[in-house]
């Protein structure tokens, strides 16, 4: 299925895909320039998230970033012809992407240098038969939870709908991205007068409390401020304007995508919050944005990847879908996607299976999924010794139960990359009495057995509709990853 959409390319301020370092003889000016680099990268990241309301949009935007840097898209169902120095990428389901760069020298390739993030974030997915009416007045959207979001953060804020449409055309079924780019709906709270116990804690029922209000089906857009009864309207039908077709989600999506509603045979639509990311804090030292988990890491990986040239390793950048719901899909980390692509790379370079296995044995994976920073109001929730902070640099994550793949050797490698890039790093481990979440690393390495480290960028309010992170940390990740991918 081919995706068709017009998506702006995310670029640096100078219009290129590459960053130019500025150096002067004035240490004060150098410090200003370094701070400007941090802010510029953070702003680019926020813009990337703004134009990526769903996993489909994120992957399409990553594709645009890759193509701006000279990458060629390959289709999995076609034969590949790979060349030394080639820069390639392929997508699966329009929601996962793997890019790779082959060194200029084919002889002496040592292995794969890989990093992975994910394209999805917790949100509400819109069900089939998406519209529910209440007492012939309200039109609600029929939704379900996608991932483990903080439910209360989705209430009483402007929301909209985006995703992918499956459109029938003369050549079969075509995927079409859609984003209803306006304040469209809201999930309203119950007033405190109707629930006096609300501030003591509310357990939200997703089928009852969390359905978005989309429209008033009784609304007359010709005479919105006049009330008249149905009998009077019927008696004076000839004097009334022609009835307007009531708004529906499919009609809105079709209009936005520029297709006939009758040609839409399937949808993958999600709610997203309309709040745009911004820098906040007394000195602009924080970033506030939806979907920082994990589009902050996905952006940092892509930016570093497009600005790197390998020497002895094949560089690989993977952004998987469905991490928030277990990764168990054909486009998730718990699939053969990564393994399939690595094997096809080896075949395209005429490497035999023994050579491929030797490459895998000398490979390394960085799994990048954001990490919990120490919370200012609840510092006791963090481990007493491993305490990452916003703007403190890359977080190396450890777990005795192997939910994170980090071990002593892989941690040492990551620390070395950070030190060579002059990037600070921190460590994270769960409190021993608090269970943590899972991520990509151990799932990916179950299919491709390589040494791996789990890292993340520190953030607060993970899985909230809007999350908080450090302004400096995206640039820190870019610098460390460029060091890794430069080998």
Locations of regions flagged by a protein language model:
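N-terminal hydrophobic/helix-forming segments and targeting peptides
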Residues: 2-14, 18-487
